[in-house]
């Protein structure tokens, strides 16, 4: 068994290469293709594998097994033949930006606060970083600002393979115990870490880093962040959304939050007025039907809690069952029914069956919805 020559370490920007097919083995995934050399990075170190093609055949997965790089395809390639490999470069460069950006963030956090990166995952939209301690929003803002400053300095990223003796004299980050040759990746002024992944050669290629969210995770926190082109994609999306909001609210781009605040205040005020009107309506209906027996009411435009409130108010004064229905505007109605000291369970079961409804509650008070017209509802109650 021979070791595959790793072209991605020799030239991380190699997008296309030629190689000899050493083996092509059938497997559950399709075929395992072993080459004498490869620019396809195999999954490892928290970084997804490269994708691309071999002679136009899609490479669906890449793993390293016993020093061999295994390319998984759905089609066979003849052993002994020569193939042209092509890397999905846009994807690879995106992953390089994410991985390199994460290193700088993790290194600066470790240097400033002593916290470790205890978990790292690259997704197609964001990356997550799990830290062993808690940082405030202000501290994270400082880390983000310093990270971007390091990026814009455009320092050369250094990759070395120190001897065992040299390693003993170095202070570097590592997520696990290391055996064999150690590959160190240095981001000047921010991080020195043992890593097998692919990285940019100059920090400026990362472009920018943006921390999107932070949440508590175990004893520390989980950061969700983006780097490189993803930052521009995110900025374009946020800017487009903000522009639409500014148009709808007739507000300047930089004043949408203030405009939304005014809208919220107005909405709160109007909700208070509506609640007052509904309370008055409930009292009026309760007075209207006092002592009148069972009552069936239809009032459009009510929310579920308002339907419940009206049914409860009328139930207290009528001498039977009160059922209140309010249209949802889509051919269905929300309802609430109540009867003091009554048991509506069987009636509700029959009504839901007849009117395509669902709902339930206590024996004397139920809520739910039905898919029926007003006339169909009235017809059922006339039975």
Where do the language-model regions lie?
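A glycine- and charged-residue-rich anion-binding loop/surface
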Residues: 1-383
